[in-house]
């Protein structure tokens, strides 16, 4: 009888040890799993960050992948030109050269007939002539007064290359493409022995109700803000300033009960566009109380302060802020390295090892 009991005890002890071992392995695995939520208003650069993760931490975009983006590059380019020409009508801007009126008609006719993924030599030539026109350039410089893709000038300045026979989009062309994110896009990659799951959530207002179930167990939130949106209004609401909308959203995320334990990383993005714009368009458009100079350093620091001041739990919660240019791979690589170090440090703290 005694032998049977001790054999059972031994088996139970082995089972208990195995359970403990599995729990420890699961615990270590969980500690190495990082869930990142990418949040921010529409067109703040979230999807570009995801593309950069594919370039930096995965195999990047193969030639075949890049070819798939050709229709998007062409569509973005054509739609940008159409948006500028339409705005000339509403803003009452005349062409520098009267002959361009005929080109504008041609643009609409040819764009309507264009095959997806094609840019005919005729359409490219029409767009090139229009883009070189003084009136079109004047209207482009007023793009804050209407909705225009950030990449408009990047693509329109490259029309010869885009229209060349055998054109294949470059990684930079791919990074610059704009497609509205609907739903949730999930990306997985490994970096510094951590397994990342990154969730990109549609930023437009209509998408926000889909976020909530992603919130639980999130390690960190990367909140993207388009610095250059300080003088723009929303695509969904012509009355609402984009920067104010971003601040409202950041306030609701930063002080949300779901995120008491979550690291919040703030990406003040599109710093390159902001640096270009701030000398021509004063920050007082967005912040009438601002009395500083319209230099990049001072204006950017003021915006950073506006966001960080929204944090109601400064004593317990730190906001980790970075100035970023999502289309610059080196910049994002450097910043993401720093972000990962913060995540590792906070993970160690949670385990009582720091």
UniProtKB/Swiss-Prot annotation:
Q: Which GO terms describe its molecular function?
A: G protein-coupled receptor binding; G-protein beta/gamma-subunit complex binding; GTP binding; GTPase activity; metal ion binding
The terms describing its cellular component in GO are: cytoplasm; heterotrimeric G-protein complex
Q: Where is this region: G4 motif?
A: 265-272
Q: Where is the lipid attached (S-palmitoyl cysteine)?
A: 3
UniProt region (G2 motif), positions on chain: 173-181
Task: Give a GO biological-process term.
Answer: adenylate cyclase-modulating G protein-coupled receptor signaling pathway
Using the UniProt annotation, give all residue ranges assigned to the region (G1 motif). Answer: 35-48
Give the lipid-moiety residues, type N-myristoyl glycine: 2
Residues reported to bind Mg(2+) = 47, 181
Domain G-alpha, by residue range, is 32-354
Q: Which InterPro entries does the UniProt record give?
A: Gprotein_alpha_I, Gprotein_alpha_su, GproteinA_insert, P-loop_NTPase
How does the record describe its quaternary structure?
G proteins are composed of 3 units; alpha, beta and gamma. The alpha chain contains the guanine nucleotide binding site.
Q: Family, per the entry?
A: Belongs to the G-alpha family. G(i/o/t/z) subfamily.
Q: What does this protein do?
A: Guanine nucleotide-binding proteins (G proteins) are involved as modulators or transducers in various transmembrane signaling systems. This G protein is involved in 1-methyladenine-induced oocyte maturation.
Q: How is this protein named in the record?
A: Guanine nucleotide-binding protein G(i) subunit alpha
Organism annotation:
Patiria pectinifera
